[in-house]
């Protein structure tokens, strides 16, 4: 199997895993921390907004089965790309959305998708999700991995109570909500 990586942030990483898991070609989705200056950060450190890291997921995928463009299509249906101050009721640096590109193809695909969404006018405000070069990724603690499976009731309450589910449904219907 050929494999590539997509590293994406869209607020709380608990809500960024499940939407990707049912698509062919996606081999794994790992919750973690990306983009900062502290090696091997802990959740507690990242939450202080002093590490430079954001909560992110790293997706391992087979490019012969699915494309980075398909992953971006899923990604933009999981969060509010018009808010760069955090996501829903999670505010601050560690919850900012970011696309971390691994190569020039990913950078161009992300720029194109962002432009396309702005031209389509799906959102009332412009899509402003930053596109940055990939620097690092550190897996989060085990209790954060596959949170939606380990804690389904809390996951559902969190997704609903934060406003994420309602936002996604209002823009995309029940896809990924």
Swiss-Prot record:
It catalyses: L-methionyl-[protein] + [thioredoxin]-disulfide + H2O = L-methionyl-(S)-S-oxide-[protein] + [thioredoxin]-dithiol; [thioredoxin]-disulfide + L-methionine + H2O = L-methionine (S)-S-oxide + [thioredoxin]-dithiol. InterPro entries: Met_Sox_Rdtase_MsrA_dom, Met_Sox_Rdtase_MsrA_sf. Its EC number is 1.8.4.11. Signal peptide: none annotated. GO terms for biological process: cellular response to oxidative stress; protein modification process. GO terms for cellular component: cytoplasm. One of its GO terms (molecular function) is L-methionine-(S)-S-oxide reductase activity. It is an enzyme of class 1 (oxidoreductase). Transmembrane segments: none annotated. Belongs to the MsrA Met sulfoxide reductase family. This is Peptide methionine sulfoxide reductase MsrA 2. It comes from Staphylococcus aureus (strain NCTC 8325 / PS 47). The gene is msrA2.
